[in-house]
C-alpha cells in the first residue's frame, strides 16, 4: 500500500540546505520535462547531491514530486488564511484575499506553475489523501468565515462553492492562463508576471466584492440573497 506524503513541519529546510537544493532542482526539471521523463540522475546532477543525500530526505522521485507539491499547497493556503485573518472589515478581507492570491503567484511563479500544472496521475495518486485533507481544512475555514459574515448581513448567503468561485475563481483563471504556455493568452516572462497580474488587482478585487456583498436596500444590484 502506497504511503501518502505528509506536510509535517518537523523538518524545515534551511536556506541552501541539501533538501532545499534537491526540491528546487526537481521543480525546474519537472516543469521542463514532466515527472515521468525526469531521471533520478538528472535531479542529483542539477542539485549537486549524492544518492545518499537524496534518500536521506526523500524515498524516491515520486515521493519527492508529491511532497514538494503538498508543501507548496500548504504554504499557499496558509498565506491566504493569514491575509484573511489580518482584516477586521469584511470588504477589506474579500479584496485582500484576491490581492494575496495574485501577488503570491507573481512572487513565486515557479511554485504556482508547479501547483497548477504538475499533476501527473502517478503523483496525484500518492498525494490525493493529504491534498484532500489540506483542501478540506482550507475551504472549511473560508466557509466558516463566509457564514459568519452572511449572518451579520454583510455578505450574500450563497452556497459555499458559489461564493468561493465568485471570490477566487477569476484570480485562479487569470493566473492559470498566464502561467500555462498552452493557454489562450500570452504567457508573460516570469520576471514580468507580477506586473502582469498587478494590472488586474483592482478589477478582480472590485468584482469579488460586488459579487459577494449583500446589496443595501435601494441598490440596483440583484437583491436576491
What residue spans do the PLM features occupy?
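Helix-turn-helix
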Residues: 18-21, 29-63, 67
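N-terminal intrinsically disordered/low-complexity leader segments
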Residues: 1-17, 184-187, 191, 216-225
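Amphipathic alpha-helical segments used for helix-helix packing
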Residues: 106-126, 176-184
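Hydrophobic alpha-helical connector segments
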Residues: 67, 81-110, 163-167, 201, ...
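Hydrophobic alpha-helical bundle segments that form small-molecule/ligand-binding pockets
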Residues: 82-87, 136-167, 181-188, 212-220
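Amphipathic alpha-helical packing segments from all-alpha helical-bundle domains
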Residues: 74-77, 125-152, 161-165, 169, ...
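Short coil/turn segments at alpha/beta junctions that flank glycine-rich nucleotide-binding fingerprints
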Residues: 32-36, 87, 108, 152
Amino acid at each position: 500500500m502506497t504511503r501518502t506524503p505528509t506536510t509535517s513541519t518537523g523538518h524545515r529546510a534551511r536556506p541552501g540546505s541539501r533538501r532545499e537544493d534537491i526540491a528546487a532542482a526537481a521543480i525546474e526539471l519537472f516543469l521542463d520535462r514532466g515527472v515521468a521523463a525526469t531521471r533520478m540522475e538528472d535531479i542529483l546532477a542539477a542539485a549537486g547531491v549524492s544518492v545518499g543525500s537524496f534518500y536521506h530526505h526523500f524515498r524516491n522521485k515520486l515521493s519527492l514530486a508529491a511532497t514538494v507539491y503538498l508543501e507548496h499547497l500548504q504554504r499557499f493556503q496558509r498565506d491566504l488564511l493569514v491575509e484573511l485573518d489580518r482584516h477586521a472589515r469584511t470588504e477589506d478581507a474579500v479584496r485582500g484575499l484576491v490581492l494575496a492570491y495574485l501577488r503570491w503567484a507573481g512572487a513565486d511563479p515557479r511554485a504556482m506553475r508547479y501547483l497548477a500544472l504538475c499533476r501527473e496521475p502517478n503523483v496525484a495518486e500518492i498525494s490525493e489523501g493529504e491534498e484532500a485533507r489540506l483542501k478540506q481544512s482550507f475551504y472549511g475555514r473560508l466557509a466558516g468565515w463566509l457564514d459568519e459574515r452572511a449572518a451579520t448581513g454583510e455578505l450574500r448567503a450563497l452556497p459555499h462553492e458559489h461564493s468561493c468561485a465568485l471570490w477566487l475563481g477569476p484570480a485562479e483563471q487569470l493566473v492559470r492562463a498566464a502561467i500555462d504556455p498552452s493557454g489562450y493568452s500570452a504567457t508573460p516572462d516570469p520576471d514580468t508576471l507580477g506586473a502582469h497580474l498587478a494590472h488586474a488587482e483592482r478589477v478582480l478585487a472590485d468584482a469579488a466584492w460586488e459579487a459577494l456583498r449583500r446589496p443595501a436596500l435601494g441598490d440596483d444590484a440583484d437583491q436576491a440573497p
